[in-house]
Design a protein with these regions (language model features):
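N-terminal nucleotide/polyanion-binding subdomain common to many enzyme families
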Residues: 1-53
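Short glycine-rich anion-binding loops that position phosphate/pyrophosphate groups of nucleotides
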Residues: 4-8, 131-136, 158-159
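Conserved acidic residues
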Residues: 25, 96, 125, 150
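A transmembrane-helix-recognition feature enriched in membrane-embedded lipid enzymes
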Residues: 33-38, 168-211
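Conserved beta-alpha
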Residues: 41-118, 122
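Short Gly/Thr/Asp-enriched flexible loops that form oxyanion-binding sites at enzyme active sites
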Residues: 83, 137-146
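Short, flexible loop segments at boundaries between secondary-structure elements
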Residues: 100-106, 148-186
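Proline-aspartate-enriched helix->loop->beta-strand connector
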Residues: 116-128, 133, 149
Length: 211
C-alpha cells in the first residue's frame, strides 16, 4: 500500500481501510508532504517511494528473473496498452494477462468470481492492481486468498503512466513536492476536489495527531 496525503485523509474517514493498511505487508510513503510532516514530528521517514516508482522497478526485476505479471485496472484498453509498451521496453518480460473490469465490478459476485478465476488460470508472480484508493486496497484484501498470485501490489494511476496515457512529473518537481501540481495541470477537473478540498484536511490532522 502506498500512502499519500489523499490516502491519509481516506484512512481517517474509513476504519476498514485503516485496518487493511495496518495489515499490509508493505506500506510506502508516497508524497513529499508526508516526508516533511514526519520530520516535523521528529519521526523521519527515510524516503518517498510511490507506486509509480516501485512498479517499473518490479517489472524490470520480473523481466530479469522470468517472473510473470498480470495487470488489472484502468480504463478499457489501457492495461493492454501498458503491456505492449512494457514488452517493447523490457526484453524477456512475461505479462500473462490484462483486464479492465467494468464499473461497479467490486459489487458483482459473478464478475468477481470471473476475475479471480482469470487470474488463477495464469497464476502470476506479480499482480498489479490499478483501481485507485480505496477500491484497489479493498478488492485485493477481500480477494487475494481467492485468486492465485504470489504478490499483489496496489498501484493506482501507474497503469496510465506505464501506458504513456498520462505523463509523470519531471524529477525536479517530484523532488520538491510539486508532483501534485503537475498532476493537477494534466487533469484539472478530476483533481481539483482532491487537491484543493479533500487534501487540505491534512492540516487539521497534523494538529489532531501532533503528540
Amino acid at each position: 500500500v502506498a500512502i499519500s496525503v489523499d490516502v491519509v485523509i481516506k484512512i481517517e474517514q474509513d476504519a476498514y481501510l485503516k485496518r487493511i493498511t495496518d495489515q499490509a505487508d508493505m506500506v510506502l510513503v508516497d508524497g513529499k508532504p508526508l516526508i516533511w510532516i514526519s520530520k516535523l514530528y521528529k519521526r523521519p521517514v527515510k524516503a518517498k517511494i510511490s507506486g509509480s516508482d516501485l512498479v517499473p522497478k518490479l517489472c524490470e526485476k520480473a523481466a530479469e528473473k522470468g517472473y510473470t505479471i498480470f495487470i488489472i485496472g484502468g480504463k478499457d484498453g489501457i492495461a493492454e496498452q501498458a503491456k505492449r509498451k512494457l514488452e517493447k521496453q523490457l526484453s524477456g518480460i512475461k505479462i500473462v494477462g490484462t483486464y479492465a473490469p467494468p464499473y461497479g465490478f467490486e459489487k458483482d459476485k459473478n464478475e468477481l468470481d470471473k476475475i479471480n478465476q482469470m487470474i488463477s488460470d495464469v497464476h502470476p508472480d506479480l499482480l498489479i492492481g490499478c483501481f485507485g484508493c480505496p477500491k484497489q486496497e479493498k478488492w485485493i484484501y477481500e480477494n487475494y486468498k481467492k485468486y492465485d498470485a504470489t504478490v499483489s501490489v496496489c498501484a493506482g494511476a501507474t497503469v496510465d503512466f506505464l501506458a504513456g496515457n498520462i505523463r509523470r512529473a519531471p524529477g525536479w518537481m517530484s523532488d520538491h513536492g510539486l508532483e501534485w501540481f503537475y498532476r493537477f495541470t494534466q487533469e484539472p477537473k478530476r483533481m481539483f476536489k482532491r487537491y484543493f478540498v479533500d487534501d487540505i484536511k491534512i492540516v487539521s490532522l497534523m494538529w489532531k495527531y501532533r503528540k
